[in-house]
């Protein structure tokens, strides 16, 4: 199969040969959903904290005697039943949100994403992508000429100039093939891949 070559002026050129084993698979929506959710879960860190009945400020003094008052018995003011008491099952920063995805499933999901991008025409190939200096304007002008605003760039050689020039562009992410993640692939409107990176992607997902 072929992927369309995107020229510097935004016009589509001749096709670039690509492996149907990676870019010609059927779309498995359930599998793609699973690996995207797992990626987000594994990137999540615990940032919630609630106090249990040991951690809230309290006294161990019994509020009133056990019998004879007519009120329900109570042991101490930190009871979860009381206002200001501790939580029964409090949220903790040590919570583990990670989800395991087998390598075989992950690679199959990534192939499914790349194939769907190719079918939708959202993935294009460029000969190479570089800038002469680490200037945001230079890279922004290149993307403007190509008609791109939200783009994930997968390059075989992420040099310092290209990395620094892309950092300040809000809707641009430049990565190497091994760092392309499922969330970024489905998030950005367009995916731009250098010719050499196509071969690297095929090698990673074969």
Curated annotation (Swiss-Prot):
Pfam families: Ribosomal_L4 (PF00573). SUPFAM superfamilies: Ribosomal protein L4. InterPro entries: Ribosomal_uL4, Ribosomal_uL4-like, Ribosomal_uL4_dom_sf. GO terms for molecular function: rRNA binding; structural constituent of ribosome. GO terms for cellular component: ribonucleoprotein complex; ribosome. GO terms for biological process: translation. Transmembrane segments: none annotated. This is Large ribosomal subunit protein uL4. It comes from Ralstonia nicotianae (strain ATCC BAA-1114 / GMI1000) (Ralstonia solanacearum). The gene is rplD.
